[in-house]
Amino acid sequence: MAEQYSLFSTVYDMFMDNVPYIEWADSIEQSLKKHGINDGIVLDLGCGTGTLTKMLSDKGYDMIGVDSSEEMLSIAREKDENTLFLCQDISEFELYGTVRAVISTCDTLNYILDEEELVNTFKLVNNYLEPDGIFVFDMNAPEKYEEVLSDNVFAENRDEASFIWDNFYDEDEHINEYVLTLFMKDDKSGLYKKHEEYHYQRNYSRDEIKGLLDRAGLEIIENFEKDLRMYYTVKVKEGCKLGNIG
């Protein structure tokens, strides 16, 4: 996924200004405190440019951000010099110790196309979570791929950049291909240059997510849906801390 954001990283925050980061930060803080996590280390998997990471850092949590795009992380480091940001594949991440909680937002986990890699990600979460820790994440609902994105085209125009977003959904493989055509303004010439990036996400059903979590020794303790996004809070199942999983 690193190459996918090499150019888009420079305009990512501009086009994501409609994302409800404040709402997400408040909701995550509420979930953490509900489960007795008032401080300590929290891992943000797929942190991107670090907007949400910084908000939670400001709320008193010691954040670690992991993302596979060095370009995205360079922007994140500018926002928060006090947070540790690591350039790693989220399905193979390594930490120095355990964390109180793990979060993953903005359908980051849908970018993991292989279910075995997603299971491995869940197992790593199991491994690094403290015994009373929680994992808070979201994924796109199946209906978003099947009914909203499907084979539709979206576009947006800003002064500094514009994009055309083509979607191609493979119903058999459950893979959505995004072809992102960017028109970015060159500061020197004032002209717009065309760039293309390709992004891929997998549509996971609700039953698949539950089953993959179960394989990793995790269980859902809270779940709700809003705006075609599925929100989960999970914990390690009793007796299934990594090392005891069959």
Spans of model-derived segments:
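Residues lining the SAM
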Residues: 105-107
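Class I SAM-dependent methyltransferase SAM/SAH-binding core
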Residues: 43, 50-92
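C-terminal lobe and adjacent flexible extensions of AdoMet/dcAdoMet transferase-like proteins
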Residues: 202, 206-246
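A short His-aromatic
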Residues: 110-112
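Conserved class I S-adenosyl-L-methionine
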Residues: 1-37
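SAM-dependent methyltransferase
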Residues: 136-210
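A short glycine-rich, Lys/Arg-flanked "PGG" loop and its adjoining helix->strand segment in the class I
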Residues: 119-131
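A short acidic, Gly/Pro-enriched loop at the edge of an enzyme's catalytic core
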Residues: 94-101
